[in-house]
């Protein structure tokens, strides 16, 4: 999963997403400072660029997902309650950000389709905050029936470690969208995941 970093223009972002679309399974649109109109314009660009709606996840903005026909919404830890959204819009897939085992269990209880756990490693987007490490993933995988994705400081060299704790997937932000060559980085992550799965 590639997660946008809210640091680029809509046009720049659209070009990067279209370019990397075949190297990632999902693209999470996490543009907190953009207006509704800007994000809707971005989604129009992606549609014109051939990015399947099934690959797109909208962060937090339920209204945008509903208006654009996007089927997956990712809710922040302090965002809308999963259960309430599921009851009102049962056709949507819902992801939830969590930072510990109990948060993940509660998200699953409320009906989340997956959880995004972090931050796993030190990262520039969380400067000064101690990473949560990988141990909670091990705990989650023992009891959760929904997929657990890992985020935060994810680098190609760390893919194997995440595979070893049975994370179902990874989410990468700056490692792709802040990279000088996003397509090359996305391709490297894809190759690392494929190699880890062969072991």
Regions found by a protein language model. Give the residues of each.
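Conserved N-terminal beta1-alpha1 strand-loop-helix module at the mouth
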Residues: 1-114, 139, 145-146, 155-160, ...
């Amino acid at each position: 999963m590639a997660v946008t970093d809210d640091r680029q223009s809509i046009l720049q972002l659209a070009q990067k997403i279209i370019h990397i679309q075949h190297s990632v399974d999902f693209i999470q649109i996490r543009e907190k400072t953009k207006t509704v109109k800007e994000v809707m314009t971005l989604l129009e660009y992606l549609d014109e660029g051939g990015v399947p709606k099934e690959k797109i996840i909208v962060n937090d903005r339920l209204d945008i997902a509903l208006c654009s026909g996007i089927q997956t919404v990712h809710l922040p830890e302090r965002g809308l309650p999963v259960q309430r959204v599921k009851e009102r819009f049962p056709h949507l897939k819902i992801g939830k950000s969590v930072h510990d085992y109990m948060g993940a269990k509660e998200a699953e209880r409320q009906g989340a389709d997956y959880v995004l756990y972090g931050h796993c490693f030190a990262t520039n987007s969380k400067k000064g905050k101690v990473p949560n490490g990988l141990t909670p993933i091990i705990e989650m995988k023992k009891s959760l029936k929904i997929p657990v994705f890992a985020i935060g400081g994810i680098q190609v060299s760390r893919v194997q470690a995440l595979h070893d704790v049975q994370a179902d997937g990874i989410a990468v932000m700056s490692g792709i969208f802040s990279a000088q060559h996003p397509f090359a980085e996305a391709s490297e992550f894809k190759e690392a995941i494929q190699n880890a799965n062969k072991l």
